[in-house]
A protein has these predicted regions:
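Conserved coil-to-alpha-helix start sites within the AMP-binding
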Residues: 83-88
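Active-site phosphate-binding strand-loop segment of PLP-dependent enzymes
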Residues: 106-246, 252-254
Length: 459
C-alpha cells in the first residue's frame, strides 16, 4: 500500500505528460518558456486571482511574498508553531521575528482569538498577555549573522542593517521587545483553509498584512472562495506530495495587487528591472522551470476530478472510523483539499502502538508534525521555553519519551500545538486509494477502545 500513489496518476496522464515534455524539448525554452505563462494564467483563473507568479518552490513563494511586502528586521510576523519549518524559516531569513500563535484544536489552524492576544502582547511588550520570544535585537543579530549581515547601531541604540531605515521608529511601538506587528501567515494545514474571515478582521484592526500559506490546501475552499485567493498574497507549493504536485520543486504566488505582482516577478529573477541586467532590488533565483510547468499543466487537466476523488476517500474514512478514533472535522462552508488525513490518538503511547500495528499490517503512516517549531533547535534563539531547544532535546532523550516529541516537563506555552504533536498521525491519502484498502486500515484500528473526546487545554 502506498501512502501517496503517484504511479496511478501517472498512468492516467502518461500520454499527455510525454507530449508536454516533448514539446518543451522541441522548443528548448527551459527558462521562462511559454508553458510557464500558460500555467500561471490557468491557475490564476482557477483560483480567481488577478495575478499568478510561478516560482521555484513553495518556500520561495513565501520568501518572495515577504520580500515584496518589505518585511525585515524589527518586524513581527505571526504564524503557527504547528507546521513545516518553511513558514517560519522565511521570516527568519529576512531578519524578521516569528511570533508563534497557538492553533484551534478542531481545525489545527491558527486560532484567531489567540492571534488577537499575541498582537496585544507584542504591542505592549508584555509576555503576561501571551508568550513572546526574547528581544528582537538578539534574535535578528543571531539570524542575520548566519547569512553574513552585520547589524549596526543607530544613535537611538536601535539595531538595523540600515541606520536610515524607516522602520527604526515604528519598530519601537513594540516596546522593549523592539517588534512592530507587520504580518500574519496562517497555514492551511492538511488541506483545510484557515478561518480567513476572522483572521482578516483581526489583521485589519491592527494593520497587518495577511499572507496565505496554501502549500497544502490548493484545491480547497472556504465559503465558495478557493484556497490561494486569501490575503494580500497567497502562496502554494507543487512539491510532488502536494494535491497538485510536479516532479521536482515548484511553487506559485497569487495576488490581486498589480504593484505586488510586479515586485514578485522582479524578485524571482534577481530583482530584475525592465532590462535583463538592470537590477532594481535585491531578489533571488526563484524561477519556475518550464519542464515543471509543462508537467503541472498535464496534471492540472485532471486536478478538479482528483479533488472530488479525495472527497470520496475522506468520506469513506469518516464512515469507517466513526466512533473508533478522532477523525478530522471540516467546518460548514469549507472544503479540504485533503493533502493529509490526520487522526488524534489519546496520547503518544497509543499513537506509537497504533502506528506499529498499521505498519505490521502493511499500512504506511506519517506524523505531521512531531515537534512544534518553538521546540526546534533552529529557533532556540527565540527562547520560548527558557531553555535552548538543544537542552530540551537532551532532556527529552534522558527521560526516554517518544523520539522527537515535546518534553512534557517544559512549560506548554502553546498547549494545543504541543498536545497535537504528541497525538497526531496520518493515514494514506490520495485520489486512487481503494475502498478495500481503507477497510483494511479500519479493521486494524477498530479493536482499540472507544475514542475519548479531546478537550481544549487551559492556558
Amino acid at each position: 500500500m502506498d501512502f501517496i500513489d503517484l504511479a496511478a496518476q501517472q498512468r492516467r496522464i502518461s500520454e499527455k505528460l510525454s507530449a508536454n515534455i516533448s514539446k518543451v524539448l522541441a522548443h528548448g525554452q527551459y527558462i521562462n518558456g511559454p508553458e510557464v505563462r500558460e500555467l500561471e494564467e490557468a491557475l490564476a483563473a482557477y483560483v480567481g486571482a488577478k495575478h499568478a507568479v510561478g516560482c521555484a518552490s513553495g518556500t520561495d513563494a513565501l520568501l518572495m511574498a515577504l520580500m515584496a511586502l518589505e518585511i525585515g528586521p524589527g518586524d513581527a510576523v505571526f504564524t503557527t508553531p504547528f507546521t513545516f519549518i518553511a513558514t517560519a524559516e522565511v521570516i527568519s531569513l529576512l531578519g524578521a521575528t516569528p511570533v508563534f500563535v497557538d492553533i484551534d484544536p478542531v481545525t489545527f489552524n491558527l486560532d484567531p482569538a489567540q492571534l488577537e492576544l499575541a498582537i496585544a502582547a507584542v504591542k505592549k511588550s508584555d509576555p503576561a498577555i501571551y508568550p513572546l520570544p526574547k528581544s528582537a535585537a538578539a534574535w535578528n543579530g543571531n539570524r542575520l549573522a548566519a547569512v553574513g549581515i552585520v547589524l549596526v547601531e543607530d544613535h537611538d541604540g536601535c539595531t538595523n542593517p540600515d541606520p536610515d531605515d524607516r522602520r527604526n521608529d515604528d519598530a519601537q511601538a513594540g516596546g522593549e521587545i523592539g517588534l512592530r506587528p507587520r504580518a500574519v501567515i496562517p497555514v492551511d494545514l492538511f488541506g483545510l483553509p484557515a478561518d480567513y474571515d476572522a483572521i482578516g478582521a483581526v489583521a485589519a484592526r491592527h494593520g497587518l498584512d495577511v499572507v496565505e500559506d496554501a502549500a497544502q490546501s490548493f484545491g480547497g475552499e472556504c465559503r465558495g472562495k478557493k484556497a490561494g485567493a486569501f490575503g494580500r498574497i497567497a502562496c502554494t507549493s507543487f512539491f510532488p506530495a502536494k494535491p497538485l504536485g510536479c516532479y521536482g520543486d515548484a511553487g506559485m504566488c497569487f495576488t490581486d495587487d498589480d504593484r505586488l505582482a510586479a515586485a514578485l516577478r522582479s524578485i524571482r529573477v534577481h530583482g530584475q528591472g525592465s532590462d535583463k541586467y538592470d537590477n532594481v532590488r535585491i531578489g533571488i533565483n526563484g524561477r519556475l522551470d518550464t519542464l515543471q510547468a509543462a508537467i503541472l499543466l498535464a496534471k492540472f487537466s485532471i486536478f478538479p476530478e482528483e479533488i472530488d476523488l479525495r472527497q470520496e476517500v475522506a468520506k469513506r474514512y469518516d464512515a469507517l472510523l466513526a466512533g473508533i478514533i478522532k477523525t478530522p472535522v471540516i467546518p460548514d462552508g469549507y472544503k479540504s483539499a485533503w493533502a493529509q488525513y490526520s487522526l488524534l490518538a489519546r496520547d503518544d503511547a497509543e499513537r506509537n502502538a497504533l502506528m506499529a500495528k498499521l505498519r505490521d499490517g502493511g499500512v504506511p503512516t506519517a506524523i505531521y508534525y512531531p515537534k512544534p517549531l518553538h521546540r526546534q533547535a533552529a529557533f532556540a534563539g527565540l527562547r520560548y521555553d527558557g531553555e535552548t531547544a538543544n537542552q530540551a532535546c537532551s532532556a527529552t532523550a534522558s527521560r526516554n519519551t517518544s523520539p522527537g516529541s515535546p518534553d512534557p516537563s517544559l512549560p506548554p506555552f502553546f498547549p494545543i500545538s504541543e498536545d497535537c504533536a504528541r497525538r497526531i498521525f496520518s493515514l494514506p491519502m490520495h485520489p486512487y486509494l481503494e475502498a478495500s484498502a481503507q477497510q483494511k486500515i479500519a479493521a486494524l484500528l477498530e479493536c482499540r477502545a472507544p475514542f475519548l473526546p479531546f478537550s481544549r487545554a487551559k492556558r
